[in-house]
Amino acid sequence: MDKDTKTESYPVRLGDFIYLFSDGYGRVNYNVEITYGDTTVTFEDFPELSEEISNYDNCIVTSAHVDDCWLCVHVEDSKYCSESHSVRVGDLLNLFSNKGILNFSVELNDFDAIADFEVPVELSKYISRYFDCVCRSCYWEDGCLCIFVKELYEN
């Protein structure tokens, strides 16, 4: 598939993913559970990004969910994705989806405009217009994934 095709999905590094859920100063806003194959490691008390959690930065996130105050991610090893890069809305939401459906609400916000999507959110519907927007930060609140984006625009 051509790199300019808007529907192409790109891998998301764990380091870039976790940073979206941090306070911007190096502390993750959630406890973190990382599952890698048959191994699960946990980081409690809202870990610092520079601590042991950084050992997993270059792993690729294959799926994610939020459970209470835990950010739970499944990862796989990646030898080709060692550079940090921006995370697009579409790539982030694909990690949380179950066969293209999200069982929570989504709010996209660029501080000037807001786009809300109520449960169930189908990734192939209206929200797909915003898939190429670049994420700045995220947080989970009352069953809604709130995503701040650099600029809210439609593809």
Question: What kind of feature is each model-predicted range?
Answer:
Residues 1-9, 77-83, 151-155:
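Short intrinsically disordered terminal tails
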Residues 26-83, 101-149:
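Acidic, low-complexity, intrinsically disordered interaction modules
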Residues 4-7, 32, 95, 99, ...:
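N-terminal cationic leader/targeting segments used for protein routing and processing
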Residues 10, 85, 100:
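Flexible coil/turn residues that form the inter-helical turn or adjacent wing/linker of helix-turn-helix
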Residues 22-23, 97:
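Short conserved AdoMet
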